[in-house]
Curated annotation (Swiss-Prot):
Modified residues (N6-(pyridoxal phosphate)lysine): 268
Name by which UniProt lists this protein: Probable glycine dehydrogenase (decarboxylating) subunit 2
Source species taxonomy: Archaea, Methanobacteriati, Thermoplasmatota, Thermoplasmata, Thermoplasmatales
Pfam family, one: Aminotran_5
Organism field: Thermoplasma acidophilum (strain ATCC 25905 / DSM 1728 / JCM 9062 / NBRC 15155 / AMRC-C165)
The protein's Enzyme Commission number: 1.4.4.2
InterPro entries the UniProt entry points to: Aminotrans_V_dom (IPR000192), GcvPB (IPR023012), GDC-P_C (IPR049316), GDC_P (IPR020581), PyrdxlP-dep_Trfase (IPR015424), PyrdxlP-dep_Trfase_major (IPR015421), PyrdxlP-dep_Trfase_small (IPR015422)
Keyword Oxidoreductase annotated: yes
Record CDD domains: GDC-P
Function: The glycine cleavage system catalyzes the degradation of glycine. The P protein binds the alpha-amino group of glycine through its pyridoxal phosphate cofactor; CO(2) is released and the remaining methylamine moiety is then transferred to the lipoamide cofactor of the H protein.
Keywords: Oxidoreductase, Pyridoxal phosphate
Length: 472
């Protein structure tokens, strides 16, 4: 399939002038008003509907989305976003409600939020949920604040959070923002948590371990129940980063593994749109002994009506305005309703199958480090090929294929992190493998000249970072 991305020298919408626009006649002749009482024209775009449509259509043609093709950005779960969820979220009954309305007038909305809380409790095998956090990192920070408040309530001075060297970068960042010191521990030769290193790192100052399972190498932490016991025996907590939840739906759960706190990325695992800075939603679930520390309000139900419950005396308080990113919560609710238990489990099975199928297709050409069996994603290394992961990622773009995540996790040199998700076909995977393999066969100068078929070719990324010019 040939690919050439559209390119337009498109101005900002405020700079578009349209001769098809017109002004309504004035009710009062302007000449009758004193000069000092006349308003100057507002600097609003004077564009017609067709000009607006064409402007944003052209911009979309210079972009790449999951609606265009495969988007295997590792650890991001860029699955297709079903349009039925968008339609439900666009209903006027939802768009026109206001957070200040009396509870009696929004019972249906509160019911949906309550049901989503119950769905997330069941999926994670946890006991209580807040829907307030507006993103995954926001959910992490909420979890960190709960951990902090919990130990303050126990009058225990625990100041350290442990993270593996394969952790998401947001884990140490969230812990630091919460006032904790970060202790990093190495992975073992199979890419999993080194238990001896964990035991050596734990002390009376340890508050929690933050971990993703499967981890960022796509490997399931086989010793997770032992890890949980080590933490709990030391009086510490176990935190589940839900970035890779798509790999375990219906198979296992954080609660069964021994986790105390979980954050969800609804904008990933639950197929809601994300990217470009938003939108997102990062609900947090906890075991019962931590439920009093959740942000308020949560949605309650007394058997007759739904209500906003502010009755948690040990709450960390609000973590967002009002009640969360409702349009994303609504999409996630509809996704769970539509799929049910069997559908969610099937999504996981297909995601893991697609990942391992693609890995098998390319592992004779690229090194796949660490333990061989992967889950929903895997990491390649281009180091032994003599070619840079960055160059191969750019090469892929010329075939209408999005690059995987490169140079992460940091413990793999020249890393390419690939997560196909369950919503791609075998044909997509075969073509992706063919292009990955062909990237090793083209001349080096050809590889470094890519991409050539995209709207924008290579940019000077160092200069862009150092000489930042923000426009809006």
């Amino acid at each position: 399939m040939e690919f050439r991305q559209a390119y337009y020298d498109e101005p900002l919408i405020k700079d578009i002038k349209s001769d098809t626009s017109f002004k309504l006649s004035e009710d009062v002749d302007e000449n009758l008003l004193p000069q000092d009482m006349r308003r100057t024209d507002l600097k609003l775009p004077q564009v017609s509907e067709v000009d607006v449509v064409r402007h944003y259509t052209r911009l979309s043609q210079m972009n790449y989305t999951v609606d265009v093709g495969i988007y295997p950005l590792g650890s991001c779960t860029m699955k297709y976003n079903p349009k039925y969820a968008d339609r439900i979220a666009s209903f006027a009954e939802f768009r026109n409600i206001h957070p200040f309305q009396p509870e009696s007038t929004v019972q249906g909305t509160l019911q949906i939020m309550y049901e989503l809380q119950e769905f997330l409790k069941k999926i994670s095998d946890m006991d209580a949920v807040t829907l307030q956090p507006m993103a995954g990192a926001d959910g992490e920070f909420t979890g960190i604040l709960i951990i902090k408040k919990y130990f303050e309530d126990l009058h225990e001075d625990r100041t350290e959070i442990i993270v593996p060297d394969s952790a998401h970068g947001t884990n140490p960042a969230s812990a630091t923002m919460g006032g904790f010191d970060v202790v990093e521990i190495p992975s073992n030769s199979e890419g999993m948590v080194d238990l001896n290193a964990l035991k050596a790192a734990i002390s009376k100052k340890t508050a929690a371990l933050m971990i993703t399972n499967p981890n960022t190498l796509g490997i399931f932490e086989q010793n997770i129940t032992e890890i949980a016991k080590i933490l709990h025996d030391a009086g510490a907590l176990l935190y589940y980063d839900g970035a890779n939840l798509n790999a375990i739906f219906g198979i296992t759960s954080p609660g069964l593994m021994g986790f105390d706190i979980v954050h969800f990325n609804l904008h990933k695992s639950f197929a809601t749109p994300h990217g470009g800075g938003g939108p997102g939603a990062g609900p947090v679930a906890v075991k019962s002994f931590l439920s009093d520390f959740l942000p308020v309000p949560v949605v309650g139900y007394d058997g007759k009506r739904y209500f906003l419950d502010y009755g948690k005396k040990k709450s960390i308080g609000r973590v967002s305005s009002f009640y969360g990113s409702f349009s994303i919560l609504l999409r996630a609710w509809s996704y769970v309703i539509r799929n049910g238990d069997d559908g969610l489990k099937n999504a996981t099975i297909r995601a893991v199958l697609n990942s391992n199928y693609l890995k098998k297709k390319v592992e004779g050409y690229y090194e796949v480090p660490y333990y061989p069996l992967k889950k929903h994603e895997f990491v390649l290394s281009t180091e032994k090929t003599g070619r840079r992961a960055l160059d191969i990622g750019k090469y892929l773009l010329d075939f209408g294929i999005h690059s995987p995540t490169v140079y992460f996790p940091l413990i793999v040199k020249e890393a390419m992190m690939i997560e196909p998700t369950e919503t791609v076909s075998k044909d997509d995977l075969d073509r992706y493998a063919d292009v990955l393999i062909s990237a090793l066969k083209v001349p080096e100068d050809d590889l470094k000249s890519r991409p050539r078929n995209t709207a924008v070719s290579r940019i000077d990324e160092v200069k862009a970072a150092r000489d930042l010019k923000v426009r809006w």
